[in-house]
Amino acid sequence: MRESRASASFGSDRGSVDGTYRVAQAYPHYGLTVVGHSLGAGTAVILSLLLHAEYPTLSCCGFGTPGSLLDRKTASESGNWLTSVVLDNDIISRLGLGTLNHLREEVLRSITRAKLNKTYIMRTLVEELDADDVMYPAGEEPSSEFKNAVDSFLEHMRRKNESAGKLHELVLPGRVIALVKTSWGQMHQMRGCCESCFRGVCCCCRSKKAYVAQETTGDAFSEIVVSSSMALDHFPDRYAEELQTLSRKWEEVTRR
């Protein structure tokens, strides 16, 4: 009866700081770990910061944590009890005003360097093309009305950003663990619908990859990596799959 009342109380208070306080006080012998994925990871980090002063043994782990979340000082000081896990090219852990501005500039510059018709390029997005066949080398693209418009726009944005002052730098919080791809295995046998698929964009012909966990810092995620896996690497099932694989490998090593 007591257990059911406690569960009901927790359910009604779920999501509130006060509710978490009451549950923690009712079960003082329990440890408290706050976890989340994506936006939930960001929420878990903020909630943990609010609770940590009263519960110093609290720990927090975020998977695919949003990139621009805490200032550098707070992010560093929380490293003893807060961990951010990032899978390979996960775009969400690299998102920020600075990285988006940089990506916009790179995309516009790349478009001005295109040799081929843009409609043709869009039709061949999932094909692997030679960059020399598609783009002029940087600085060697011919002058055009579009290129001049892009140059003017980027110069305007640079002046605007300079007049606004330096951006307040925000980084990934806590200790950062990166799950890094170490090798590409053989491609699974492709079905007919995916014969032109580029490097496993489709789930039905995804390559088998090996990952290793490496401790790093938030500075390693200061640019958005444009790749075929940048969105897929954020999916919770991908995190679960690779973490389970690493856990099994660790168990095998420790048993030897």
Question: What label would you give each PLM region?
Answer:
Residues V35-G40, A44:
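Gly/Ala-rich beta-loop-alpha elbow adjacent to hydrolase catalytic centers
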Residues M1-T33, I46-R256:
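Alpha/beta hydrolase fold serine-hydrolase catalytic domain that processes acyl esters and thioesters
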